[in-house]
Regions:
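Short arginine-rich
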Residues: 35-42, 68-90, 94
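GIY-YIG nuclease catalytic motif and its immediate N-terminal context
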Residues: 1-65, 94-145
Length: 145
């Protein structure tokens, strides 16, 4: 059985990309154009790095659903005037909070695994947002990423 994660990568904490994979190291190399197969949306830059990943979601279909909700945290298929609040790392974290607030997990082992760099960025820019995220999900800080 393959273990899938939903991940967010960032370029300089402005541009973000959310996806799923069962082989993150390979997928990141694809996004950074080291090997073929990266998403069209990430080809503009070649220095993407992990911000966080969500683990513990039971199966691929549930991870796909979670990813869809990360792309549409307000539940709407089309972008509207409220979509801009979900831009950048802080916007994606805010969207993650909304998804976690509304999305019902059958598995309570869902965790947010965040890089130390991303953690420090959020604490500097918006400590309250980190505390809000912490109220919805257990967060592990990844020291060596």
């Amino acid at each position: 059985m393959n273990c899938y994660i939903c991940y967010m990568i960032t370029h300089e904490y402005k541009n973000t990309y959310v996806g799923i994979t069962n082989d993150f190291e390979k997928r990141l190399k694809q996004h950074n154009s080291i090997i073929k197969g990266g998403a069209k949306a990430t080809h503009k830059y070649n220095d993407w790095k992990l911000a966080f990943y969500i683990s513990g979601i039971e199966d691929k279909n549930s991870v796909l659903s979670f990813e869809w909700h990360m792309h549409h945290p307000n539940g709407k298929r089309k972008k509207d005037s409220t979509s801009k609040k979900y831009y950048g790392v802080l916007g994606r974290i805010y969207g993650l909070c909304e998804v976690l607030n509304h999305y019902k997990f059958e598995n309570k082992n869902v965790k947010c695994n965040m890089t130390k760099e991303c953690y420090e960025y959020i604490m500097k820019e918006n400590k309250e947002l980190y505390e809000l995220l912490e109220s919805f999900i257990e967060i592990f800080i990844l020291e060596n990423m």
